[in-house]
């Protein structure tokens, strides 16, 4: 068998893979003499970094104990038989150690520690490997730190002080309008509707509670005109936020109250000239005459 020809195909595994190229079960116990000579010849030429010169290869009688990869920078535990010469890159470097590149042993991905150390040195200076060592890129800081927040505080305080508006000066008290006796309203406490047996009173039994403003406006209108036309009644209802029926009933009740006071006083007010006596009754809500004291807007036909 031509071992020299076979070794031409095995020169890369023997020189580059090192001791971990073969497992403990599949590695041969010894090399033929011709294969050892081939390895020696390749190492002496310096074509590959995996062999020693022939004197160093002949002096050593076996490999050092092989070790399994446990962590980066830790040698492999022993798993291969002895009887092999140690592999080195060159006579100037001494015995070499190989480490896996994050792959299984069968993949054959190994590198030399000396080259890896040089690369790490360059990375630590250039990029700050592992966060240690100064580099051209300084460590990043949070965008909003305590110093920035402290610097923003005076600006925010100034903005807040500008946003605060000065209180408006109190307006001078306007003189109250003159109040006549007929404008004064005597309020009675509202009577609650009686609760029926079914639990609620009938809607017709509920009284409308007028506000003071509504009563004042109704009294003013009654003082000038005791009878309202339908157009005027609708206008007053819209102004006071009432309905037409409420205004009509209030004027009817107010006329009845006025007549009761006149009867109790023993004096009958004279009827307006030109107005028949029947028109002053309570049977109708309209009047065919015009009162001399009525306002121009309350003139009825």
From Swiss-Prot:
Pfam families noted in UniProt: Homeodomain
Keywords recorded for this protein, A-Z: Developmental protein, DNA-binding, Homeobox, Nucleus, Transcription, Transcription regulation
DNA-binding region: 203-262
GO CC, any one term: nucleus
An example molecular function term from Gene Ontology annotations: RNA polymerase II cis-regulatory region sequence-specific DNA binding
Keyword check for Transmembrane helix: no
Subcellular location: Nucleus
Polar residues bias (residue ranges): 26-38, 55-70, 284-301
Antp-type hexapeptide (motif): residue ranges: 179-184
Chain segments carrying region Disordered: 20-77, 127-149, 255-301
Job of this protein: Sequence-specific transcription factor which is part of a developmental regulatory system that provides cells with specific positional identities on the anterior-posterior axis. Acts on the anterior body structures.
Protein family according to the UniProt entry: Belongs to the Antp homeobox family. Labial subfamily.
Protein name in UniProt: Homeobox protein Hox-B1
Organism of provenance: Pongo pygmaeus
């Amino acid at each position: 068998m031509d071992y020299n020809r076979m070794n031409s195909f095995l020169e890369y595994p023997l020189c580059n893979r090192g001791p971990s190229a073969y497992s403990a079960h599949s590695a041969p116990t010894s090399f033929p003499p011709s294969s050892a000579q081939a390895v020696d010849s390749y190492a002496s030429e310096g074509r590959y970094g995996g062999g020693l010169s022939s004197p160093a290869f002949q002096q050593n009688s076996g490999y050092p104990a092989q070790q399994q990869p446990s962590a980066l920078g830790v040698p492999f535990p022993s798993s291969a038989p002895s009887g092999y010469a140690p592999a080195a890159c060159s006579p100037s470097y001494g015995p070499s150690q190989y480490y896996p590149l994050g792959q299984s042993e069968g993949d054959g991905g190994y590198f030399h520690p000396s080259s890896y150390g040089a690369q790490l040195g360059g990375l630590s200076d250039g990029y700050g490997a592992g966060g240690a060592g100064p580099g051209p890129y300084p460590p990043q800081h949070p965008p909003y730190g305590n110093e920035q927040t402290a610097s923003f505080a005076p600006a925010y305080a100034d903005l807040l002080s500008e946003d605060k508006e000065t209180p408006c000066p109190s307006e001078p008290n306007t003189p109250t309008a003159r109040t006549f006796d007929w404008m004064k309203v005597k309020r009675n406490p509202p009577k609650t509707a009686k609760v029926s047996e079914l639990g609620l009173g009938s809607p017709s039994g509920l009284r409308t509670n007028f506000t003071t403003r509504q009563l004042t406006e109704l009294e003013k209108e009654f003082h000038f005109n005791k009878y309202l036309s339908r157009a005027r009644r609708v206008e007053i209802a819209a102004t006071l936020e009432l309905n037409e029926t409420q205004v009509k009933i209030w004027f009817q009740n107010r006329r009845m109250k006025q007549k009761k006071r006149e009867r109790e006083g023993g004096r009958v007010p004279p009827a307006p000239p030109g107005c028949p006596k029947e028109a002053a009754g309570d049977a109708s809500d309209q009047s065919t005459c015009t009162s001399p004291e009525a306002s121009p807007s309350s003139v009825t036909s």
